[in-house]
Swiss-Prot record:
Name of this chain's protein: Phospho-N-acetylmuramoyl-pentapeptide-transferase
Pfam families linked to this entry: Glycos_transf_4 (PF00953), MraY_sig1 (PF10555)
Major localization listed first in the record, in broad terms: membrane
Keywords from the UniProt entry: Cell cycle, Cell division, Cell inner membrane, Cell membrane, Cell shape, Cell wall biogenesis/degradation, Magnesium, Membrane, Metal-binding, Peptidoglycan synthesis, Transferase, Transmembrane, Transmembrane helix
GO molecular function, one term: phospho-N-acetylmuramoyl-pentapeptide-transferase activity
InterPro entries: Glycosyl_transferase_4, PNAcMuramoyl-5peptid_Trfase, PNAcMuramoyl-5peptid_Trfase_CS
Family: Belongs to the glycosyltransferase 4 family. MraY subfamily.
Catalytically driven reaction(s): UDP-N-acetyl-alpha-D-muramoyl-L-alanyl-gamma-D-glutamyl-meso-2,6-diaminopimeloyl-D-alanyl-D-alanine + di-trans,octa-cis-undecaprenyl phosphate = di-trans,octa-cis-undecaprenyl diphospho-N-acetyl-alpha-D-muramoyl-L-alanyl-D-glutamyl-meso-2,6-diaminopimeloyl-D-alanyl-D-alanine + UMP
Function: Catalyzes the initial step of the lipid cycle reactions in the biosynthesis of the cell wall peptidoglycan: transfers peptidoglycan precursor phospho-MurNAc-pentapeptide from UDP-MurNAc-pentapeptide onto the lipid carrier undecaprenyl phosphate, yielding undecaprenyl-pyrophosphoryl-MurNAc-pentapeptide, known as lipid I.
Topology class, membrane: Multi-pass membrane protein
GO biological process assignments: cell division; cell wall macromolecule biosynthetic process; cell wall organization; peptidoglycan biosynthetic process; regulation of cell shape
EC number of the protein: 2.7.8.13
Organism field: Thermodesulfovibrio yellowstonii (strain ATCC 51303 / DSM 11347 / YP87)
Length: 361
């Protein structure tokens, strides 16, 4: 919106040419979403408290979490608003990929909002029945995937790119559709499962957003993409602005969500952020890199799958003391801040390894 105005004026005012650069607008998106989050969070937290939109803590969870009862939740509304403001201000709204991301982000956020609202009003942790939530996620992910599948401007619609190799491409054909849907829905739920400690998910999503911004910028830049043997997909570079908005919003939210949290993002935040990461990976064909940079998310989700499966097969036995994995370490007497910081450290290392894939080709 603001970008369009400034861009049109750049022909008359030479100093405004700087707004043509994606890198500059990405930085502005980071700052805009950060300060917007920082400013609106306090009144929003008070508003959530006033409406009694507070967290219900499970009785079978770690006992240290019982003191969090009554903490405002649904703070993901703050993140959603901040990302939208920054994207609408500094993003190129004529770019169709940008609109795909906005729809995906808002769609998963809406599913999370309904889930959170039902949890609060029913005063339990179940919320939206699993089959309905999964159906809504599959429907939204299918819409995103089908739009990309029938996009005539994308020459790599059904291609899976293998990192570490020079343009090793596998054309999955029609089978790419269920794969892409799995990536988007899986990413959304994996971030949701990781959001069980103060600041854990926000910090890891922020780290992943940095890597995604770099990958997107390169994918949308013909020269850099050719030099680094990355698939060149015109128009995807603009999504670096979206990643910048996510990073700024996560940093601003961390100010209030870090231990001890003043507010939780809830499913409205975790599902929208996870869905966005999955959608970004599918758009740029970096699905495998997403599994690397989001390694913590993958492990957290796998820990739940293994725990549930093993529990059913062995009639009540467990692999972990509790799943997701971060609760396992909590029950091993690791202080919550230590678990969070150590997972962040692993996330940073995985982010660096993900960026290394650009040169190891």
């Amino acid at each position: 919106m603001l970008y369009e105005i400034l861009y049109s004026l750049s022909d008359y005012i030479s100093g405004l040419n700087v707004f043509k650069y994606i890198t500059f607008r990405t930085m502005l998106a980071i700052l805009t979403s950060f300060f917007f989050t920082f400013i609106i969070a306090p009144p929003c937290i008070r508003w959530l408290k006033k409406l009694s939109l507070t967290q219900h803590i499970r009785d079978d969870g770690p006992k240290t979490h019982l003191k969090k009862e009554g903490t405002p939740t649904m703070g993901g509304i703050i993140i959603t608003a901040s990302v939208l403001v920054a994207v609408l201000m500094w993003g190129n709204l004529k770019n169709h990929y940008m609109w795909i991301m906005i729809i995906s982000f808002l769609g998963f956020g809406l599913i999370g909002f309904i889930d959170d609202y039902l949890k609060i009003t029913r005063k339990n942790y179940k919320g939206l029945p699993g089959r309905y939530k999964l159906f809504a996620q599959l429907l939204l992910a299918s819409s995103v995937t089908l739009f990309l599948y029938f996009n005539p401007k994308d020459p790599y619609t059904t291609v899976l790119s293998i990192p570490f190799f020079k343009q090793w491409l596998i054309d999955l054909g029609i089978f790419y559709l269920p794969f892409a849907i799995f990536v988007i829905v899986g990413s959304s739920n994996a971030v949701n499962l990781t959001d069980g400690m103060d600041g854990l998910a926000a910090g890891l999503v922020g780290i992943a957003s940095i890597v995604n911004a770099v990958l997107l910028y390169i994918s949308g830049h013909a020269v850099f993409a050719k030099y680094l043997y990355v698939l060149y997909i015109p128009g995807t570079g603009e999504l670096a602005v979206f990643c910048g908005a996510m990073l700024g919003a996560c940093l601003g939210f961390l100010w209030y969500n870090s231990y001890p949290a003043e507010v939780f993002m809830g499913d409205v935040g975790s599902l929208s952020l996870g869905g966005a990461l999955g959608s970004l990976a599918v758009i740029t064909k970096h699905e495998i890199v997403l599994a690397l940079v989001g390694g913590i998310f993958v492990v957290e989700a796998l820990s739940v799958i293994l725990q549930v499966g093993y529990f059913k097969l062995t009639n009540g036995k467990r692999i972990f003391r509790m799943a997701p994995l971060h609760h396992h370490f909590e029950l091993k007497k690791w202080p919550e801040p230590k678990v969070i910081v150590r997972f962040w450290i692993i996330g940073i290392i995985l982010a660096l390894l993900s960026l290394l894939t650009l040169k190891l080709r």
